[in-house]
From Swiss-Prot:
The species this protein was found in: Sulfurisphaera tokodaii (strain DSM 16993 / JCM 10545 / NBRC 100140 / 7) (Sulfolobus tokodaii)
Name of the protein in question: 6,7-dimethyl-8-ribityllumazine synthase
Entries under Pfam families matching the protein: DMRL_synthase (PF00885)
Pathway: Cofactor biosynthesis; riboflavin biosynthesis; riboflavin from 2-hydroxy-3-oxobutyl phosphate and 5-amino-6-(D-ribitylamino)uracil: step 1/2
CDD domains for the chain: Lumazine_synthase_archaeal (cd09211)
Length: 155
């Protein structure tokens, strides 16, 4: 029987690395706990730079889902809003384009450094859980050849 575990890639921003490093450690540990394989950790300078790395990882047949991890801290301008909004939009577009989950483990916008620290565990573990759940459910859906009159629930 072939291995049914989920192969993940994690794209992590180096900006605010005191936060994202801890997010990465939590994400790797949680993926292992849930039985998934982290095949690639790809570091990018900042959250805004994630899209190109995500795209390259989604092209790979040996990657089932991509988890993104970042922290976009509020500054004196609206720069954090632009970064967070555009990053989220683009990675969602890539997920739909490639038919693979890309989950949003990016803290912000509008958060302080202290608020971001408080959210490390929640954002990293939820992003991993969502990636694994969605990859497994998509795998099950794609196995179904024909839908008959009975309702199918994939969970």
């Amino acid at each position: 029987m072939p291995d049914q575990s989920i192969n993940l890639a994690i794209v992590v921003a180096e900006f605010n690395y005191d936060i994202t490093y801890l997010m990465l450690q939590r994400a790797i540990a949680h993926a292992k706990f849930l039985g998934a394989n982290v095949k690639v950790v790809f570091k990018v300078p900042g959250s805004y730079d994630m899209a190109i790395a995500v795209k390259e990882l989604l092209k790979r047949d040996d990657i089932d889902a991509v988890v993104t991890l970042g922290a976009v801290i509020k500054g004196e301008t609206k720069h954090d809003e632009i970064v967070a909004t555009q990053t989220a939009r683009k990675i969602l577009d890539l997920s739909v384009e490639y038919g693979k989950p890309v989950t949003l483990g990016i803290i912000g916008h509008g958060v302080t450094h202290e608020q971001a620290v408080e959210r490390i565990e929640e954002y990293s573990t939820r992003a991993v859980e969502a990636a694994i759940k969605l990859a497994k459910r998509l795998r099950e859906l794609r196995k179904i050849q024909t839908l008959n009159e009975e309702m199918v629930v994939i969970e």
